[in-house]
Each structure stands twice: as C-alpha cells, then as structure tokens.
C-alpha cells in the first residue's frame, strides 16, 4: 500500500482509538490532568514516577530519576512509558500541574492495535471490510483491556502485532531497518516487550539461516540489532543498577496455566465471561491470564478445521510459527505446570538455568505472542474457508456480549 493509504488508515485508527478511550475511561476522565480514575496501585505508582521525573533536572543517563524515593534508578524501571516521559520532560515548562499523558497513550495503544491488525489481515485477504471487522477482535481481547486498566506500559500489544506484520508481509524491503526501530522503541516502553521481540527476531533470523545458509547476513542482522538496542538502553539508564538486581523471585510463580485460553477468571473476584465458568487456577497465574473470549474460541475451531483439511501443507507452511509458539508456551508455563488447580509437573531447575530465567519473573506474559497468533491464523482460516461474512459479525457480537460483565 502507498504512503497516502497508510496515512488515511492511521488517521482512521486514531479516530477509532480516541472513541474507544472515551468508552474505556469515561468522557470526564479524558483530560491530561484528571486523576480520579487512578484506582489501581500500579497506575498511581506510575504517575508518581512521572511526577518525580518531570520535576527533576536532566541527568545522564537521560532516564535517571534520582529523586524518586530511595530507588534512585531510571524511569525505565517504572511503568510510566519511558518514551513518553522523556518527550514530556522536554516540554515540562509548558505543561500544566498534575500533567500526565495516560489518555493519549491509551488512545495510541488502541489505534496501533487496530492499525497493525488490519494490515496483517489485509495482507492475506485483500478485503478492506473483512480486515476492518477482524481488527476489532484484537481490540476486544481481555489481555489488552486488562493490562490497560492498570499496567499502562504493558498495554503496548501493538508492538507484537507490528513485529508479526513485518514477518508475515510479502514486502521484505528494509525489514532489518524496521526491526531495529521496533525493537529499540520497545525498550523505551517496557523491557518485557523487548525480550519478546528480540527473541522473535533471533528465532526468525536463525530459521532463515537454516533455509538459505547465509551466515554472513545472520551475523550482520543480529549484531546491528544488538548494538542499536544496547546503546539505547545505555542512554536511557537500564544499566544504572547492577544486573544482579534484576534477578528475583517469580519465575515458576507468575506463570500461565495450561487452560489459560479458556479460563475467564484470574482470581476469585474477577471474571471476563458471561457464559463460561471459572476453571480455577493457582496464585500468581494472573500474570499469565490469557482468556480468548467466547467469540475467538469459536473462531479458533475454524482454524482447526482448516488445518486438518490440508494437514501436511499447512504444517509445512506454518512450521516456524508452530515452533515459535512452542518456545513461548514453554516459557509461559514454566517448570511448574498446572491444569486448572491441579499441579501436573513441578521440576526443580538448576541454578544456572533459574538465574537467567529470573529476569523474566512474570513469564506468564509470554503467552501474548501465542495468543495473537491464534487470532491471526483463525481469522485467515475463516476467510479461506469462504464462510459467509455475516457469521464473522455474529462472532464479534458474541465476543462483546461474553466480555460484558
């Protein structure tokens, strides 16, 4: 698509994103100084980190938040969306008291979620209407709405979709440049996305090496990405604390359940389904919450049908995405695997494995790329099975009704 088409799509996505933000926050909370909707600890904590950062002078590294209590570390270790915090600090003398950019950020997350999901589906269908309707399945997902409710920086799921768009697109021109930009930007939003994107980049790069045996390009590609990433992380303050301080308790606790895609509840007090019952899980698995929604669960059955209609060709064609999903699922389920409340496996990891894995203590979040791959390929399968369009609308309505409580 040409630049004009992309611009129009982006503007429309922003308009839809703004409308969704009004529904999400309420019209009265759209202002950039309104804090009444800060009811979650994480949102309040992020706001305080931003306030301290804006009221401090510039330091080096640029993200240093020296007055933030006893922490005295970088803004990147808060959830205050570092890239927006840095931009806000440039203009801090012109900003109102109690300023925050959170409604703008939520609008951008909704908008880019629509933008990239539309482009992914359009890449396979070349159908504008189908792609637009499909994009709303990526918006009305519990994992996105749940995160935007209190973990603002972790609402940037569009980063995952943007990366998949690069890999799934037929146009590979300048893909290395776009990958560097995307992975670098992710480090200015939240490091969990950086780990996910870098892992995906390394995986696909290695897969291409196995296919084409181009060792020179494999090395060059990953060195360029790594240098760009490390330099960015250095300038914004990732290394102001010792690496050992990033290790901690959590891996094997903040994980995902084997039934996470079908379990609408991550605690006894919350449910995301009007129709499906709470399956049950164990403490800590809220980080791996991955309920698809009834509409998407039904949609995924069409993916299963499509796969088995042409089993061998489908497996060969999508082997790399199957392997990638297995890797992320293993990380999300960890060494302590549960089916509902029942503990299936609990392996004791040696220290040399547990220590590096402790960096991703909330490993349940690694379910997200798999979650979006399920939606992407389910929508593509639905289209290729030539099912009447009105049934897709029906599934979207079912999804909305199911999430209504």
Predicted regions and their residues:
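Membrane-interface helix-loop junctions at the exits of transmembrane helices
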Residues: 22-28, 132-150, 233-243, 264-271, ...
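Start-transfer (signal-anchor) and selected internal transmembrane alpha helices
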Residues: 1-30, 220-227, 305, 309-325
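Hydrophobic, aromatic-rich transmembrane alpha-helices
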Residues: 293-315, 325-330, 375
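Periplasmic/ER-lumenal interhelical loops and adjacent helix-loop junctions
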Residues: 40, 232-304
């Amino acid at each position: 698509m040409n630049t004009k088409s992309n611009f129009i799509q982006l503007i429309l996505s922003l308009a839809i994103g703004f409308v969704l933000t009004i529904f999400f926050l309420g019209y009265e909370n759209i202002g950039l100084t309104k804090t009444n909707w800060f009811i979650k600890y994480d949102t309040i904590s992020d706001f305080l980190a931003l306030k301290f950062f804006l009221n401090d002078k510039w330091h080096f590294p640029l993200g240093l938040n020296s007055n933030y209590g006893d922490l005295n570390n970088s803004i990147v270790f808060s959830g205050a969306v570092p890239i927006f915090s840095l931009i806000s600090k440039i203009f801090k003398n012109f900003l109102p008291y109690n300023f925050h950019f959170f409604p703008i950020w939520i609008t951008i997350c909704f908008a880019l979620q629509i933008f990239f999901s539309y482009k992914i589906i359009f890449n396979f269908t070349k159908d504008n209407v189908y792609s637009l309707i499909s994009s709303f399945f990526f918006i009305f997902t519990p994992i996105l709405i749940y995160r935007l409710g209190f973990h603002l920086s972790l609402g940037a799921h569009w980063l995952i979709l943007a990366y998949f768009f690069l890999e799934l697109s037929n146009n590979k021109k300048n893909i290395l440049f776009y990958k560097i930009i995307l992975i670098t930007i992710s480090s200015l939003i939240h490091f969990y996305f950086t780990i996910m994107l870098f892992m995906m980049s390394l995986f696909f790069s290695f897969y291409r090496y196995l296919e084409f045996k181009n060792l020179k390009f494999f090395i060059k590609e990953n060195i360029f990405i790594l240098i760009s990433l490390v330099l960015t992380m250095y300038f914004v303050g990732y290394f102001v604390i010792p690496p050992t301080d990033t290790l901690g308790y959590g891996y094997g606790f903040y994980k995902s359940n084997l039934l996470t895609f079908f379990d609408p509840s991550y605690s006894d007090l919350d449910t995301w389904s009007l129709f499906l019952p709470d399956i049950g899980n164990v403490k800590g698995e809220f980080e791996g919450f991955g309920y698809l929604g009834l509409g998407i669960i039904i949609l995924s059955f069409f993916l299963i049908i499509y796969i088995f209609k042409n089993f061998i060709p489908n497996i060969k064609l999508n082997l790399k995405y199957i392997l990638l999903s297995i890797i992320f699922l293993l990380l999300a389920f960890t060494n302590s695997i549960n089916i509902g409340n029942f503990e299936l496996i609990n392996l004791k990891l040696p220290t040399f494995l547990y220590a590096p894995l402790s960096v991703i203590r909330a490993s349940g979040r690694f379910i997200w790329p798999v979650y979006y791959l399920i939606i992407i390929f389910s929508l593509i399968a639905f289209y290729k099975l030539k099912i009447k369009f009105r049934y897709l609308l029906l599934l979207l309505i079912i999804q909305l009704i199911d999430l209504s409580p």
